[in-house]
Every structure is written in structure tokens, then in C-alpha cells.
């Protein structure tokens, strides 16, 4: 789809290799080994104009972001049910790294030029729970789950989803990235980004015995759940902030 191709340049992870690594899980962390700053950005355009926002971003942002060592990843996808809405999982080394990115001359140009096409923008601060991915690869199929968990079950749910998502990236060569975040203001609300090699890889994972076990184990903990599907994606995995592990 043309809009996806245009917006792929806005997924500014640094002009990375597109070869696929063997099955392994590698966390995104700061140089000190801590979780980085994570947030979700929800960008909504006026009707039919998300592609124009993507064109602006592709023109003014990539060269600057590539030089920002603290801008780890900007993984963006377009909702299937609302192609005027893009969700980005943004990962920065620190608050200072985010400040550098958001106040750069290139970003200010992008923000000014997109204004005429922008219907809404929401930033959601979250804490990283699982930030695991392959060393390299290109994800074509992405899903988000929004889970609202019973307060008494938050710790257990976090333990189970962390173990399963880490296992999936570590053992399955077609699961490219698994990300779990919890809202800072509502720590019982979790948002995921699940990145797969392609649609077949996603279906295979969803039909796996391990994933079905995860569903059974967490069913009673979930108060509400929403699944968000996206148009075909082109997420190039970042290398910034990725701690390469040979064996985990």
C-alpha cells in the first residue's frame, strides 16, 4: 500500500541491515543497563492526509534521527480500521535524549509542516516491561494488545507475559520483537507491540501451544482486552540500545 511505503521512512531506526538473525532475544537498555524512556505517540491526521504527514517526516527527519544516539527506536504502524491513525512506540535512552530529539531543528520543521494535516496527537508515558527483539530484521505484521488487568493480579500477569514474550523472541526466528509497556498513571493497563516477520509467522505463533497456554494462564486476570490490527508494516529493527546476547 502506497501510504505504508511513504510512512516507512518515518520509522526512523537508523538505516539498518535487513538480514534476519537466528532465534535469540536481545533487550533494549541504556548503557548503564537500565530500562530506557518509553512512550506511545498516537498521531491522527485529517481525513486522507496521513500519507502527507509521512512524506514530510521522510523528507526532513531521517538524517537527523540517524545521528541521535539516544533516539533508540521509533516503531510506527497504521491502524487497519482507521488508516488516518498511526501509533508509534518511541524508545529513548533518557529524558535528555527525548529533549534533544523533540527540540531539534528537523523535528521543529516536521512539526510545523505537519500541523495543517494534523487532527490530533496524544503522548502516553509508559514504563517498559519487556523490550526484546532480534538483532536485525524487518517486521511486516504487527499487533497491539491493550490489557486491563485486575489490580490484585498485576504482578502475576507481568511475570507470565514477560516470560512468554521473552521465550517467543528467543526461540522463534519469525518473532522479531515483543514489547510490553504499562501506563505510568494506570499500571494495571498494559500495551504491547508484537512484531512478526509476516502474517504467516503471526498466525503460527497465535496457534502455538505456548501462546495458547499463555492465554489460558491469564484469562481470569483480564478485565478488558482490545486487539489492534495494523496495515502491512515495514519496521526495520533498531540496533541502538540493543544488548546483543549470544545465549540467554
What are these regions (language model features)?
Residues 9-19:
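Bacterial N-terminal signal peptides
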Residues 138-198, 204-205:
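Conserved small-residue-rich
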Residues 26-100, 161:
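Ordered, small/hydrophobic-rich secondary-structure cores
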Residues 51, 93-105, 155, 198-208:
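Short amphipathic alpha-helices within nucleic acid-binding modules
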Residues 49-71, 106-109, 153-176, 210-214:
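Short amphipathic alpha-helical segments
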Residues 43-48, 92-93, 148-152, 196-199:
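Structural beta->alpha junctions
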Residues 25-35, 75-84, 109-148, 176-189, ...:
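Glycine-rich beta-strand-turn "strand-cap" elements at beta-sheet edges
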Residues 1-11:
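Bacterial N-terminal signal peptides that target proteins for export
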Amino acid at each position: 500500500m502506497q501510504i505504508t511505503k511513504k510512512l516507512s521512512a518515518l520509522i526512523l531506526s537508523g538505516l539498518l541491515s535487513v538480514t534476519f538473525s537466528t532465534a535469540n532475544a536481545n533487550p533494549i537498555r541504556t548503557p548503564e543497563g537500565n530500562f530506557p524512556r518509553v512512550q506511545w505517540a498516537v498521531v491522527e491526521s485529517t481525513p486522507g492526509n496521513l500519507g502527507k504527514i509521512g512524506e514530510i517526516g521522510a523528507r526532513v527527519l531521517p538524517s537527523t534521527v540517524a545521528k541521535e544516539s539516544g533516539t533508540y527506536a521509533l516503531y510506527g504502524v497504521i491502524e487497519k480500521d482507521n488508516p488516518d491513525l498511526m501509533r508509534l512506540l518511541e524508545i529513548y535512552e533518557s529524558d535528555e535524549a527525548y529533549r534533544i530529539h523533540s527540540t531539534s531543528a528537523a523535528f521543529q520543521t516536521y512539526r510545523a509542516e505537519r500541523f495543517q494535516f494534523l487532527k490530533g496527537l496524544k503522548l502516553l508515558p509508559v514504563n517498559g516491561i519487556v523490550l526484546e527483539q532480534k538483532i536485525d530484521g524487518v517486521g511486516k505484521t504487527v499487533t497491539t494488545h491493550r490489557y486491563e488487568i485486575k489490580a490484585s493480579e498485576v504482578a502475576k500477569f507481568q511475570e507470565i507475559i514477560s516470560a512468554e514474550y521473552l521465550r517467543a523472541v528467543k526461540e522463534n526466528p519469525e518473532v522479531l520483537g515483543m514489547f510490553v509497556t504499562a501506563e505510568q498513571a494506570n499500571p494495571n493497563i498494559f500495551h504491547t507491540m508484537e512484531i512478526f516477520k509476516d502474517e504467516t509467522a503471526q498466525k503460527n505463533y497465535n496457534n502455538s501451544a505456548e501462546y495458547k497456554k499463555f492465554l489460558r494462564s491469564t484469562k481470569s486476570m483480564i478485565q478488558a482486552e482490545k486487539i489492534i490490527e495494523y496495515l502491512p508494516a515495514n519496521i526495520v529493527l533498531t540496533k541502538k540500545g540493543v544488548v546483543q546476547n549470544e545465549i540467554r
